[in-house]
Amino acid sequence: MEEKRPTLCIVAGPNGSGKTSTTMQLLHYEWTENSLYINPDNIAQEQFGDWNSPAAVMKAAELATKMRYECLEKRIDFVFETVFSSDEKLDFVRKAKENNFFVRIFFVCTESPEINVKRITQRYLNGGHEVPISKVVSRYYKSLLNLSLIHISEPTRPY
């Protein structure tokens, strides 16, 4: 009998694209029902008290990274959100594939970084977390580049 492959579901895209809204819908599907959900924004708010504090955000990112690698090691199904603008995330997808994870990538994006900036501003005015405009713009283009690189280099299932 063949061992069940663990599943990694990544919801990726630039800041302010709607990753969390998309993830909330995906978490209702049968194939994610037993998955651990790792979200650095939630970790910053719930465990370190403030998602607008640079120190809390840094601690949350470190904890989320640790949790992701533990899931790989223990072969646990999991879902995580990422801006997908760092090379580390590309390496992580490769490691998951090497560990025989079934990888699904849902890429959420708007048609321009200006739209993302407006969405983030509205989110902040409604009590959410902010992201500096310069980071929104640079991450927007880097995440698109990384999506094209992962699609070319790794047989994944992007949506």
Please identify what each model-predicted range represents:
Residues 1-5:
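Phosphate-binding P-loop
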Residues 14-15:
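The conserved Walker
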Residues 19:
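Conserved lysine of the Walker
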Residues 24-74:
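Conserved substrate/cofactor phosphate-moiety recognition/catalytic segment
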Residues 59-107, 143:
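Glycine-rich phosphate-binding loop used to anchor ATP phosphates in small-molecule kinases
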Residues 101-146:
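A glycine- and Lys/Arg-enriched "phosphate-lid" helix/loop adjacent to the NTP-binding pocket
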Residues 150-159:
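Single conserved hydrophobic/aromatic residue that forms the stacking wall/gate
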